[in-house]
A protein has these predicted regions:
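Anion-binding (especially nucleotide phosphate/pyrophosphate-binding) glycine-rich loop
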Residues: 1-92, 100-102
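Phosphate/pyrophosphate- and phosphate-bearing ligand-binding catalytic cores of soluble enzymes
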Residues: 11, 106-150
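Compositionally biased, low-structure terminal segments
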Residues: 36, 62, 94, 139-142, ...
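Short, structured patches in soluble enzyme cores that scaffold and shape functional sites
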Residues: 45, 68, 83, 94-100, ...
């Protein structure tokens, strides 16, 4: 048995866990490509989500400003396609690199393969418990992009 944790911020254990507990603690944020109006950023699954949003804002990269203060780590964000105020993870998601729990092979999932929907993805159902994500590729605007619902 394996229990994979992100940051553990929404876990409440009421009894002993009869499993190997694996907490993803991979760190790293780096710009891997720059274009005229956007940048591609690789982010490790163990990075704190809100800290990633702040890092991007400090560099004037836009796209996920509305998703600040969402608890948890980057690695768990695609499971339910986190979102707030008209913006969702899928709006900046390009792909993620994963490791198969069954045979430890690597597999890259594109945005299309993740089948993002409202608070949903392939990792919440068909691929639940089958892969561990380690790195993500996101595309951000070179200036903040405000989406304000009035």
């Amino acid at each position: 048995n394996l229990l994979v944790l992100g940051g553990g911020s929404n876990m409440l254990l009421t009894k002993d866990v009869d499993a190997l507990v694996l907490q993803i603690n991979l760190r790293g944020i780096s710009v891997i490509s720059s274009f005229e109006n956007s940048v591609h950023i690789e982010v490790a699954a163990g990075e704190n989500w809100h800290e990633l949003v702040c890092w991007c804002l400090n560099k004037d990269f836009g796209g996920l400003e509305n998703l600040s203060l969402i608890p948890g780590n980057v690695g768990t964000a695609p499971i339910q396609n986190i979102g707030a105020y008209g913006v969702e993870l899928k709006d900046v998601f390009l792909d993620c690199n994963t490791l198969s729990i069954k045979d430890q092979s690597e597999k890259k999932f594109t945005k299309e393969e993740c089948k993002f929907a409202y608070r949903n993805s392939i990792f919440k159902h068909q691929k639940k418990g089958k892969y561990i994500a380690d790195f993500f590729l996101f595309s951000y605007f070179c200036t903040p992009f405000l989406k304000i619902n009035l």
